[in-house]
């Protein structure tokens, strides 16, 4: 199964991605995690990405596309994957579509976690406090919401018109939301 999980920052994508990936026996591939690993390890890519993420901006498409393609080419993604944090704009949608077409593949579904923006801000501030994430301060959160709204929300319409968007209410206990996701995906396939 080839899946995307989308939602504004703090919607619970990362929280749900691991369980969804395990359920469908595919790797969960998070661009944010890949970037944070590079930052933590002090790689050249990590240094570039840190400055961009600290400002609340999105990493340039060329960097993101290259990292995602490299990861999708690994053996464990041959029979499916769950992408979290990619694509985030139409250029990335086109890059992913081209990759899938070139490999004779298609997306099965795009999960959209829907959560009220005010609740998202509260979640992110709490997460920043618990995890010490420097990319989650109030000003950066507001900027990330704006960037998400302007660049990523139009993708939902693209996937809706392709008939593969699966909207899911992202508010509630983690297990509740997870069961909604499984039910929505199972009814789609």
Curated annotation (Swiss-Prot):
Location of the protein in the cell: Cytoplasm
Catalytic activity: AMP + ATP = 2 ADP
Similarity section: Belongs to the adenylate kinase family.
Comment on protein domains: Consists of three domains, a large central CORE domain and two small peripheral domains, NMPbind and LID, which undergo movements during catalysis. The LID domain closes over the site of phosphoryl transfer upon ATP binding. Assembling and dissambling the active center during each catalytic cycle provides an effective means to prevent ATP hydrolysis.
HAMAP family, per database record: Adenylate_kinase_Adk
Region (LID): 126-136
Subunit structure: Monomer.
Function comment: Catalyzes the reversible transfer of the terminal phosphate group between ATP and AMP. Plays an important role in cellular energy homeostasis and in adenine nucleotide metabolism.
GO cellular component, as recorded: cytoplasm
Keyword Cytoplasm included in the entry's annotation: yes
InterPro entries: Adenylat/UMP-CMP_kin, Adenylat_kinase_CS, P-loop_NTPase
A single GO molecular function term of this UniProt record: adenylate kinase activity
PROSITE patterns for the chain: ADENYLATE_KINASE
PANTHER family: NUCLEOTIDE KINASE
Residues reported in the UniProt entry to bind ATP: 10-15, 127, 172
Presence of keyword Transferase: yes
UniProt pathway: Purine metabolism; AMP biosynthesis via salvage pathway; AMP from ADP: step 1/1
GO biological process: AMP salvage
Organism: Cutibacterium acnes (strain DSM 16379 / KPA171202)
Positions that bind AMP: 31, 36, 57-59, 85-88, 92, 133, 144
Name this protein carries in UniProt: Adenylate kinase
EC number(s) on file: 2.7.4.3
Keywords: ATP-binding, Cytoplasm, Kinase, Nucleotide biosynthesis, Nucleotide-binding, Transferase
Region (NMP): 30-59
């Amino acid at each position: 199964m080839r899946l995307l999980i989308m939602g504004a920052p703090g919607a619970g994508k990362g929280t749900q991605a691991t369980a969804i990936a395990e359920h469908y026996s595919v790797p969960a591939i998070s661009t944010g995690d890949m970037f944070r690993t590079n930052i933590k390890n002090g790689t050249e890519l990590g240094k570039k990405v840190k400055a961009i993420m600290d400002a609340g901006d999105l990493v340039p498409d060329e960097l993101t596309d290259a990292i995602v393609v490299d990861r999708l080419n690994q053996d464990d993604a041959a029979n499916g994957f769950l992408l979290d944090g990619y694509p985030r704009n139409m250029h990335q949608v086109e890059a992913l579509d081209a990759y899938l077409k070139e490999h004779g593949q298609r997306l099965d579904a795009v999960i959209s976690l829907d959560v009220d923006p005010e609740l998202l801000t509260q979640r992110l501030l709490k997460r920043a406090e618990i995890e010490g994430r420097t990319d989650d301060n109030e000003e950066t959160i507001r900027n990330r919401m704006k960037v998400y709204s302007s660049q990523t929300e139009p993708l939902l319409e693209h996937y809706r018109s392709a008939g593969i968007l699966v909207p899911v209410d992202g508010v509630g206990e983690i297990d509740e939301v997870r069961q909604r996701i499984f039910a929505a995906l199972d009814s789609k396939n």
